[in-house]
Amino acid sequence: MPKRTDIKSILILGAGPIVIGQACEFDYSGAQACKALREEGYRVILVNSNPATIMTDPEMADATYIEPIHWEVVRKIIEKERPDAVLPTMGGQTALNCALELERQGVLEEFGVTMIGATADAIDKAEDRRRFDVAMKKIGLETARSGIAHSMEEALAVAAEVGFPCIIRPSFTMGGSGGGIAYNREEFEEICARGLDLSPTKELLIDESLIGWKEYEMEVVRDKNDNCIIVCSIENFDAMGIHTGDSITVAPAQTLTDKEYQIMRNASMAVLREIGVETGGSNVQFAVNPKNGRLIVIEMNPRVSRSSALASKATGFPIAKVAAKLAVGYTLDELMNDITGGRTPASFEPSIDYVVTKIPRFNFEKFAGANDRLTTQMKSVGEVMAIGRTQQESLQKALRGLEVGATGFDPKVSLDDPEALTKIRRELKDAGAERIWYIADAFRAGLSVDGVFNLTNIDRWFLVQIEELVRLEEKVAEVGITGLHAEFLRQLKRKGFADARLAKLAGVREAEIRKLRDQYDLHPVYKRVDTCAAEFATDTAYMYSTYEEECEANPSTDREKIMVLGGGPNRIGQGIEFDYCCVHASLALREDGYETIMVNCNPETVSTDYDTSDRLYFEPVTLEDVLEIVRIEKPKGVIVQYGGQTPLKLARALEAAGVPVIGTSPDAIDRAEDRERFQHAVERLKLKQPANATVTTIEMAVEKAKEIGYPLVVRPSYVLGGRAMEIVYDEADLRRYFQTAVSVSNDAPVLLDHFLDDAVEVDVDAICDGEVVLIGGIMEHIEQAGVHSGDSACSLPAYTLSQEIQDVMRQQVQKLAFELQVRGLMNVQFAVKNNEVYLIEVNPRAARTVPFVSKATGVPLAKVAARVMAGKSLAEQGVTKEVIPPYYSVKEVVLPFNKFPGVDPLLGPEMRSTGEVMGVGRTFAEAFAKAQLGSNSTMKKHGRALLSVREGDKERVVDLAAKLLKQGFELDATHGTAIVLGEAGINPRLVNKVHEGRPHIQDRIKNGEYTYIINTTSGRRAIEDSRVIRRSALQYKVHYDTTLNGGFATAMALNADATEKVISVQEMHAQIK
């Protein structure tokens, strides 16, 4: 039955900002859905508040709204655009919740909009735990013993039945937010209190513990004629008790017998039938008790998910695209499989002749005080995927693709340490981010497979694989490089050993292993991901490396090629913005007739989609892997400036190996990043910088600090996302920093800068082609200098800076671009204090602001710069004028503090945000208000505000207090702030700080007295003292600001209505022309 003709236009709901548990896999699914539906001739309307996505590019949909995904805003869009249908299965939990809310509020009925892809009833049946349990019983499947609670009393009654340990999960939240495992009553009450607070329906599901059981997932697609296929089976390497998003996973499932697999396959199809999913993809999760084989259904998601992105990349089967077409009435047998060039229909189940491993990437080092043990609440921020012919090869490739400094199973503990065994046992039993390496250490320390199994519950089959690799490592260390004869080296490479790891084991340099491979002519071949285990010929070049005989790469010899190196796994400081740039580079160069080659290993992204580039190599972005691809493809140029720090780190080594790095030269990049060389350039150009020094010892630092003056910003050289960067206020602070943080720099020096307190920070993105410098955009930060630029909200155009100051910056950017010989993108950061412009830093590469600026101005910077790198001047492209839009765009960040209880949510020079949203308005206030709504802030228009500010802010706080009064707020203040306000004739209610007696601030926050808090501090002591204010505000969902500038922006936004007017990107850009 072909597509529906009763609908003409479809509204797709996006997933909003990137948060832990919902990352860029939804940009991938949303972008695919837009393409698939427009291909069928539908008018597509898209709403997504995240500007760093490909799906919000103006050419992806007919009308694109970068607006908050909030039912009232979406109602405005529906009223204006009048879609016939809404597709909510592409935007994760955010989109599902929004669709259900639109249904509940009667919006869909009011405007006659049909929900496609999933019915409200099916979503509710899958998400509502009680209905789900009843449905499973009906088809003869077991679920965990459980109960549902809406209050603490009910929860305790359920716990009495289920017993401890038990697992608590709030309904309608994602990434396991607010859930956890309770081993006793005290922990139980704490988790339930948090869960009741986070669940939009105030509902908790309390389950018997299945900890230690094996966990499996099935990716299923079903159409309305009841054709059902399993796209992929996924097995969790880690047992139940660790959220599947934080588990290492393997596809296809490795330890099921055929009979067990068939039982699970049939069960998952039965689940989709019963829940009523008949137009799209779902994932069904199972737990199996390894002792007796008891099978339990854990849950099902009636939408495209993180696992379906993984399954799509693992098999080459585009689940989101197929799901979008099924949603408009097609059946599986009517759709053709792209990868085989239409030789097979989409109703053929993919079969694969390789093994895929996914490993999550964590960022605990950014959250001092966070609990870094893995539980049922998801904490990872990204993931890496690797493909190999065996489990061992795929696992070792994934370990090196993770970019955490490991080249394979590098040891974590020294076996000479008397505490070694205790530490290993602790890490195995209570898993953290590095357990996989401790397993290898356990085998080195003499534990048996059973010994490790008893501590971890990881299937013995996986453990045997790791043990074998450890024994091989011992052999390499024993025989050294002379013992690496051709056959032995081939065996090692087949098992996924990296040159760098072998070099470390044999005690030689990596280059020597490479030389040895050249002597033996030992190189990888490339195999294709083709959905059919090489049964049919394939047109798409989607490749992975392995050490076998036959190479299927078949590179072209008649076309000019350009290779783009991606950014690897997402992490804080290097996220979707960089992937966005890589995709744009590929699209632009394809349009210009080049053959484009993408190298990346992140399964969540659009860059690793098989039709983004002409050729895709799903490989770790390391020197060894990239050089092997260059050897076979021989590209005319390689782009390293777009994937963040990952490919940049390789620039020099690639150049040294004779690889043509295009754009800004590695030497110019080094001139900008190396402190001393940069200093010389700045002095030549006579630009101002904050007083600074480079030091290599504690004593030297103490001396220099006296000359520069406190406060100081201290950091190691060469970092992204401000790792190990801090503001120190006195000598004791400085000494503590050197003792605790400086080990990051591996004998590299530490930089000291005088900290410009209260300066306004500004970001400028520009493109230089050697002749002309194009200013992409000047963004004024809302938080003052000292907050990492990636964590600060910003406005384009600037909202307080004078024209003169902006012109000074334009001139300085131009001088720097020419001095550093930039070819392509560059980003410059300035600080403005007392009308003086200070240069903070220059990055001759794509910055994380590029997507935001492109959306705000309508100039696709990443595309323009990619063409510049390939030799096309700005004049030839007709892009030489800076665009200053007639409206305001505000970028606001999203922070993951709710996942890390115990971490102080104070913003500082270390970047901690995971994602961003954008708000657009006729005024700064309207744009800022929209950005706040988009980032799920809890800003209220009136109520009671608490003011508690540091010495340096006391003059300006009077003005803020007056604005809040005018808005109708009642005011409270702490002692020092109250005195200043009193002198100005404003009399707030006085409140006690925590150590001044009760009722104090924290009591009042807990009692729900405040709707807004502003709390600014400086100095380590004051920061520690006021931490409980910030933590309580976060916990009780009170909107708070930790900078005075943020407070003023909030006060302005209170007058604006964020839900009143919606504007599409296409309408915005039309205003510019």
Swiss-Prot record:
Region (Carboxyphosphate synthetic domain): 2-403
Region described as Allosteric domain: spans on this chain: 937-1073
Cofactor section: Mg(2+); Mn(2+)
Residues binding Mn(2+) 4: 841, 843
Residues given in the record as Mg(2+) 4 binding sites: 841, 843
Domain MGS-like: 937-1073
InterPro entries: ATP-grasp (IPR011761), CarbamoylP_synth_lsu (IPR006275), CarbamoylP_synth_lsu_oligo (IPR005480), CarbamoylP_synth_lsu_oligo_sf (IPR036897), CbamoylP_synth_lsu-like_ATP-bd (IPR005479), CbamoylP_synth_lsu_CPSase_dom (IPR005483), MGS-like_dom (IPR011607), MGS-like_dom_sf (IPR036914)
GO biological process: 'de novo' UMP biosynthetic process; glutamine metabolic process; L-arginine biosynthetic process
EC number(s) stated in the UniProt entry for this protein: 6.3.4.16, 6.3.5.5
Carbamoyl phosphate synthetic domain: annotated segments: 554-936
Record pathway: Amino-acid biosynthesis; L-arginine biosynthesis; carbamoyl phosphate from bicarbonate: step 1/1; Pyrimidine metabolism; UMP biosynthesis via de novo pathway; (S)-dihydroorotate from bicarbonate: step 1/3
Description of its domains: The large subunit is composed of 2 ATP-grasp domains that are involved in binding the 2 ATP molecules needed for carbamoyl phosphate synthesis. The N-terminal ATP-grasp domain (referred to as the carboxyphosphate synthetic component) catalyzes the ATP-dependent phosphorylation of hydrogencarbonate to carboxyphosphate and the subsequent nucleophilic attack by ammonia to form a carbamate intermediate.
Name of this protein: Carbamoyl phosphate synthase large chain
